[in-house]
């Protein structure tokens, strides 16, 4: 099932007029001024979607906390509440040419998400943008107090068991942020019905990982392994990608 679902993500990208650009393709592109039409449109899209993304991230975090049976752990609910308060406080999307194909947050300015202009231009769909917004909002929610460290640990343990990989530390945090991204994008799809096929809309939250050069680093799993790990953690999403319902 995982092989079929992973193939469906990248197959949909090939025919989708709103397909995300793969990460390795973005990395090879020249820098894009913040005044370029693609960057301006991307920044406006991200700013428009930010309020809804914040609300859906809150839902996703609460669901994951329940799914991973963390609610009964001492102090965890208070930490999640602090994380959600930090998420709710985010107000600004700031495009940045030097950030290129990345999005990032800085603890000294937790109300702002910085988006590279190449990244903004490479995510032409609402679903793709929502997934990345959610990823960055989780980092903000975790903050300097490690509010979500127990969730990162739990996701890393489950992902390690299901994939036979060793996923801990920063890669577990990044994978959890991606997991919240896919869950949040799926909630967005449910909240905004359209005539587009379900697999196409779902795939947009993952399609930027459909790379030719599949390389990870000390902090991240490789893009294609990320797709497989996320689909392994979310079998419902895998079935929807394969069967369209």
Show the residue positions of the predicted features.
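A Zn2+-metalloprotease active-site environment signal
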Residues: 2-231, 235-244
């Amino acid at each position: 099932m995982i092989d079929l679902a992973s193939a469906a993500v990248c197959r949909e990208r090939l025919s989708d007029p709103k397909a995300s650009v793969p990460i390795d393709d973005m990395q090879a592109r020249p820098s894009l001024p913040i005044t370029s039409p693609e960057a301006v449109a991307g920044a406006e899209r991200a700013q428009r979607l930010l309020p809804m993304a914040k609300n859906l991230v809150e839902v996703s975090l609460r669901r994951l906390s329940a799914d991973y049976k963390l609610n009964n752990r001492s102090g965890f609910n208070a930490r999640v509440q602090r994380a959600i308060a930090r998420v709710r406080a985010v107000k600004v999307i700031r495009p940045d040419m030097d950030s290129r194909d990345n999005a990032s947050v800085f603890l000294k300015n937790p109300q702002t998400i910085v988006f590279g202009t190449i990244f903004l231009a490479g995510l032409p769909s609402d679903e793709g943008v929502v997934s990345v917004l959610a990823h960055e909002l989780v980092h903000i929610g975790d903050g300097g107090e490690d509010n979500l460290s127990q969730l990162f640990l739990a996701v890393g343990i489950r992902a390690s068991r299901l994939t036979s990989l060793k996923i801990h530390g920063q890669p577990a945090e990044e994978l959890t942020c991606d997991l919240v991204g896919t869950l949040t994008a799926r909630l967005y799809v449910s909240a905004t019905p359209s005539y587009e096929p379900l697999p196409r809309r779902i795939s947009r939250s993952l399609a930027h990982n459909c790379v030719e050069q599949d390389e990870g680093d000390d902090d991240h799993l490789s893009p294609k392994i990320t797709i497989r790990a996320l689909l392994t953690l979310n079998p419902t999403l895998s079935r929807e990608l394969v069967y369209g319902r």
